[in-house]
A protein has these predicted regions:
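Short alpha-helical segment of the dimerization/phosphotransfer core of two-component systems
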Residues: 6-14
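Short beta-strand/loop element within the Bergerat-fold HATPase_c
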Residues: 93-105
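Acidic ATP/Mg2+-coordinating residue in the GHKL
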Residues: 113
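Short conserved segments within the C-terminal catalytic ATPase subdomain
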Residues: 52-62
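Short helix-loop "hinge" at the ATP-lid/N-box region of the Bergerat-fold HATPase_c
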Residues: 86-87
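Short conserved segment of the HATPase_c
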Residues: 118-132
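Conserved glycine-rich
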Residues: 159-160
Length: 188
């Protein structure tokens, strides 16, 4: 029975991985030309992830709003992956914060968790497909090692950047910088 459970778990993991790989291969065919209100989109992500957060006794907060041009489907996936990771790695009883601000040329999206942090030497590698900090984290937190690679690709498609802004044993802040609507319109 234990072996059967393990096989089922691995089959489900492979299925999820295949789905994400297919998503990644089709990214460039998705049009990125809609006006997107990032605040309401982020609130929708938090609503969809609320059951996972409640299960881990994690509060979710979102503040700010900004208008960008892009694909709502892809930007939803970007925010979803960042917030899901933040929930996955945060300590029970903590808070995941999503903040959005427009600094006149770029929209800054920050996702802040209260997890174990990311060592300095891995802060760029985490965006590579299948990268894992270590196998024990992989087993403890799940995932296929593709979520942040997908975030990287989606951000690049929208003309932006993503990075680990800060990280310590008290948590991590991921920063996504995307051209705001006025900059995106002048670049078209």
């Amino acid at each position: 029975a234990e072996l059967l459970g393990l096989l089922q778990e691995q089959t489900e993991r492979m299925s999820r991985m295949t789905k994400v790989l297919l998503e990644m291969s089709e990214l460039r065919s998705v049009p990125c030309e809609d006006d997107i209100e990032l605040g309401p989109l982020s609130e929708e992500v938090l609503t969809d992830l609320a059951p996972l957060a409640e299960h881990k006794d994690i509060a979710l907060n979102c503040s700010g709003c900004a208008l960008i041009i892009g694909s709502d489907t892809l930007l939803y996936r970007l925010v979803f992956n960042l917030v899901e990771n933040a929930i996955r790695y945060s300590r029970p009883g903590s808070t995941v914060n999503v903040s959005i601000c427009d600094n006149n040329s770029h929209v800054l999206l920050r996702v802040e968790d209260q997890g174990p942090g990311i060592p300095k030497q891995y802060r760029e590698s985490i965006f590579q497909p299948f990268f894992r900090l270590d196998k024990s984290r992989s087993r403890a937190y799940g995932g296929a090692g593709l979520g942040l690679a997908l975030v990287w690709e989606i951000t690049a498609l929208h003309g932006g950047t993503v990075e680990v802004e800060t990280s310590s044993e008290n948590g991590t802040t991921m920063l996504v910088s995307l051209p705001n609507r006025s900059v995106a319109l002048t670049e078209q």
